[in-house]
Amino acid sequence: MDIDTKIKAYRFVAYSAVVFSVIAVLSVCITLPIVYNYVHTVRRQLHNEALTCKGSMKDVWADVHHLRVDAASNRTARAVRYGRDDAAAGNGPNFDSGCEGCCQPGPQGAPGAPGKPGRPGKPGAPGFPGNPGKAPQKPCEEITPPPCKPCPQGPPGAPGLPGDQGDKGEAGQPGQPGSDAAPGEQGPKGPNGAPGKPGAPGAPGDEGLPAVCEPVQKGEPGSTGEPGPVGPPGPSGQPGNDGTPGQPGPKGPPGPDGKPGADGNPGQPGPVGPPGTPGERGICPKYCAIDGGIFFEDGTRR
């Protein structure tokens, strides 16, 4: 795969992982409070139902206890006539009518334990609105205040504070149109009008007198005029003589190395060298299978 393709694939995988991670975190943040609220609500309902069941069970046990107490206190002794044929025949036991005085109930038992307080009732409906009140009636005999000594009138009090500004009044009706004004004075003179059309040509005039010839006199010379424009360039002149040769310039930098030259002629053979050291002695190995080594004739082992 190309490097760009790999980078694009890794980038897609990284972005996808980040997006899924964000979605998972948001889902957990939204789901956890909902689940906690649901579990808390169910737990509270179960607790309330358990309390209701316990209260109902206590009420049932209290009723059973009261029934047992009432049955024990209201129990009546019954006598059976033994030896009669009608009792054996299955007609039921017969009570002796002469023993009614002996079957009186016993004394009343002790009062039972006080019952549980009842549940609070529902709030009552709101009452009807009351009747409107009546104005107080005047007493039949008006009570006159006791007479007091007349006093002189006191001085007037200080002027009160100015009241608030009143509301804006309604717009008034439009007034009647005014009378015409007097004529004004004459205005200033206006500007001149446009020139009129040229008139018709006049009649030719009379012939004039003949001219008198007078000697002509020269006038004074005029002032100097401005200089004229620059003229065109003249033709090229002849070439000048050669100048003297200048001094030699400084030495230039060394040039690049040239190519290696051709091989020279072979030199004369050199003198004979000194004799070399004697060579090592020849070997003839003999293999010993027991020791597994190699021995030489000189007794050495390598």
UniProtKB/Swiss-Prot annotation:
GO terms for molecular function: structural constituent of cuticle. The gene is dpy-13. Nematode cuticles are composed largely of collagen-like proteins. The cuticle functions both as an exoskeleton and as a barrier to protect the worm from its environment. Mutations in dpy-13 affects the body shape. The lineage of its organism: Eukaryota, Metazoa, Ecdysozoa, Nematoda, Chromadorea. Residues 188-197 have a biased composition (Low complexity). Collagen polypeptide chains are complexed within the cuticle by disulfide bonds and other types of covalent cross-links. GO terms for cellular component: collagen trimer; cuticular extracellular matrix. Residues 106-135, 154-210, 219-278 are annotated as: Triple-helical region. This is Cuticle collagen dpy-13. Belongs to the cuticular collagen family. Transmembrane segments: none annotated.
